[in-house]
Amino acid sequence: MITKNKKEGIKTMKIKNLKLIAAASVILVSSLFSKELASTSVSSKATQRVLNGENQSPGISVLNINNIAYWIGKDGAYTTAGSPNGTMADYPIFTGGFIYSDGMLWGAKVKGDGQGDEVRVGGSTYYHGLKAGRIITDSEGNVLGSDDPVNNHVWRVRKDYASADLTVDAANYYAVGTGDVTATQIAVVKNQYEYDWYNWPAAWGAPYHDVNGDGSYDPDVDVPGYPGADQTMWTIANDVPLIVDAAGDSIGFSNTAPSLYGADPIGIELQITLWGYAFGASDPLGNNIFKQAKMKYMGLPDTPDGAMLDSLYFTQWSDPDLGTYTDDYVGCDIDLSFGYVYNGNRLDGVFNGIFNLPVPAGGYDFLQGPPDNMDIDEDGDTTEF
């Protein structure tokens, strides 16, 4: 059971009064062939996306450091607005669609929060139950409301942005061929990287490499993003309807939770970290991206102490579309905690028919779940996953 702790400002594990951060690390695996691809042309359905040069606040962005292009919206859920395929993820990059949509999903028995004991479901599938922004608390940890979504965007950094040739990066972002990308488009992408580097939301929970070990993010010393990664994207979202300003005063109301499956909001903050490594297609890491989802149960402004989530389930939801979506099969390997998609026919209309490539396969591998607070192996350590 997960109970509320007002001093911490979040819910805590009942047994040891620890912060609940449910982290599901997911690896997106795509394989069957290794081939470097040049971007010379894209689908005519491609649309240009221009970053706002004044507020540097893209509503969507893409992880594209290696052989996968994976888009996400600032609410931490899928978007099909970035890829010319109308999909969330493309593999290999600049070719066919791989994942149509995905998102984090949870369900729990909510007890003692004043809305009646009931099962509630939250997160994102085809419908989005969250909005961008963090949950705002006072100095005592009382929930005041949620941040205005307009103050948030998809933060994206790459550690070599200042010196790297960003032609391929910009071409993928703008859905144009590498020969057609403009100097202005490359400059906009570079400027966004710089903006996010110097405005990295470490205070809200975004990961970074604390180079000098002082516990505070310094953009002139530290490295933003998942430590060691070549590229990182980060979002923060919540289901608290009341929107407040920095002083905690009400400025709006947006109840997104019922948009998913009709359930009332719980008071969840979800942080998504996506990262990848700049390896080529012949290296396994060049065909993988990593995802970490941190879920905090903080409650609503009127949630009493002692409210709890019982029997919580937290999972990755996905609708994979592998090229031609009408001939896809899915499977799972329980021992490896691996779910995958593969083509039901020998040939695929998109990969074989358009790009003259063998059809790939891929899926999701759960690497680590939340700590269960139980000493199952009797080694004296209750921090087990």
Residues of each region from the PLM?
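Bacterial Sec-dependent N-terminal signal peptides
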Residues: 1-39
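A long-range scaffold signal marking pre-active-site subdomains of enzyme folds
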Residues: 35-385
